Amino acid sequence: MAEIGFRRNMGLFMAVMIGIGATMGPGIFALPGELAHMIGPLGILVYLAMGFLTVFTALNYSELSAAIPLAGGGYSFTHRTLNRPTAFFTGWFFWIGNTLACSMYALIFALTIRAYFLPEASIPLLTLLTTVVFTAVNFMGMKEAIIVITVMNLVELAVLIGVAALGFTDIEPANLEPLAPMGWGPFVPAMALIYISYVGFELISNAAEEIIQPGKNIPRAILITLGISTAIYVFVVGVMMLSLIHISEPTRLQV
């Protein structure tokens, strides 16, 4: 029986859209306020440091995806290079991790919808509806899912850049003083807090068998995704810290 494979019909742009859609989730809307409360203006450096450290993971995924351009990402890497038990557990860990991440994203999305549009809505119901809608979109097919992802990515980027650009005119350098009102102790815990904001680009490798010229486009897509995400995070958080707040003692920013 002949094996049924995937069609390579996804270019660099579509691969980047997958990466940005998975990486720039609701975390950028929910975490900066917690970060400001936790560490103050030093949060700008936290995002920069996390972006720098993530480069090493991104380079690993780039190299492995180019060498093993198979669907499955991390599972395929371990299956080809190690052994079946390791690949089995790797696949399950990815599945569990992504399921938990998607659950968190759906919850944050529901909280945002209720906060700004439907104050009387039920959070469990909104979370369930969000999960059902996006699951249905994925079942429609890759082409339809990419269209939805692209539209949502462009809207999200426009909102983030637009809001940050408006706040850019109100920047006050004095808000950087003191830079670390809570000290440097929370720096590493703060990096752990925002870690999930840098997770997602690895999903590009999961679609390796559908990407045209995977050896060239996958590494490019991964690094472009990480670069865009880091730049947007630093810009948005930097403007927020410099224009909206002045932290001289622990205070919580409401997002």
Q: Where do the protein language model's features map onto the residues?
A:
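Alpha-helical transmembrane segments and their lipid-water interface positions
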Residues: I18, F29, T54, A58-Y61, ...
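Helix-loop-helix junctions that connect adjacent transmembrane segments
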Residues: A2-F6, I44, L48, F117-L125, ...
